[in-house]
């Protein structure tokens, strides 16, 4: 009798590294998770230690197999999904980073972005990379490291330094430096990649003065990139055969592989993607055009709206404001009041993402009166997540001409029934919550499994997708529009706050 086989998904996120073991029926067998340090050297700056990312991720891999009580030779393949845009530069010879990882949330490159705008690069970047000029993307982060670490640009030219997003870093470490590779989805988030020619963009490399020698090879999201040895007797070599940035992995895990299907992931930030099939839709409404995974991991395109603060705003209620002890408490307190008593919270702690793209916006609470209590502020913070999602959906529908009939949701905050119901109310559309919540890991597992024949095709996966609960709108259109108008007023007043500082 042959031993039962499994897929392992490594999910390297913004605040933790996770490993998930799945069987052929897409059941989760075991999960391991380790948090790591968030480093804030200056206001608006965010870093991670790349060695800590690697240490936490590699230890979760060992732990998850031990928890599942399976041996490494029962693993058919490993898929990787990761926080996108986060930028690492390391020495080819030693594998040692020359600087901390600069995280996607970090705003330190706002000045470089202003220069790009002044130099008239906006249209070129929009047309060729699908992105807007913002500190969010990797390109300006790589430039910043090369500008600030002495001698690094020359070393990069000589081929001594390598750049990678987190997927590239993990695969480099897992293959002992044999494989320097990324996939199309991660490359499409760097602002250095031409999403039409599917190659690094020479003009962007020239403008940011980034040597091509340091860039990884770009491949499909579902194929064998290399093999890793995860110990065990004789050290079984396991194929690494799936890579996708976290949001594209979630889109694939939700099986949004047809044009017009959309999902929203509620994690640290909020990320909404709509598959636009084989055509790259240029956004006129502040969204990104990005690469997604087609039915067999080939290139599809998607529209994306990124909201910077979702789950992070609930953490703020807990850690900084001390209004709740646990993120799960937010639903309980939000339902202790009938409404927000006119309060709007705009959680623009690190600026605003789509569709506004204002790095100078800052967080604010509007509509405070003497009758407002902590529960109103908690409720308004949760509601802000749903309002920001509507901002993105309005832009998406305008760009694509597609009216969304249902939104598939995933991520930690979808366990919050109050938030999901309010999301449906404020969108005026169905919200579908799947039974398997780990859809990001699921997407990475699907991509890895399809590449090695663990699953034969998408039809086999469709049978495994079960909707656990559907939320339907429960408020009238006039009420919906009235509340949303208040939100738009609040957003307007939070914008450009920092710009006026001398």
UniProtKB/Swiss-Prot annotation:
Record InterPro entries: ATPase_NBD, Carb_kinase_FGGY, Carb_kinase_FGGY_CS, FGGY_C, FGGY_N, Glycerol_kin
Keyword Plastid found: no
Metabolic or biological pathway: Polyol metabolism; glycerol degradation via glycerol kinase pathway; sn-glycerol 3-phosphate from glycerol: step 1/1
List of residues binding ADP: 14, 18, 268, 311, 412, 416
Residues at which sn-glycerol 3-phosphate binds: 14, 84-85, 136, 246
Record-given protein name: Glycerol kinase
Source organism of this protein record: Escherichia coli O81 (strain ED1a)
EC numbers on record: 2.7.1.30
Subunit structure: Homotetramer and homodimer (in equilibrium). Heterodimer with EIIA-Glc. Binds 1 zinc ion per glycerol kinase EIIA-Glc dimer. The zinc ion is important for dimerization.
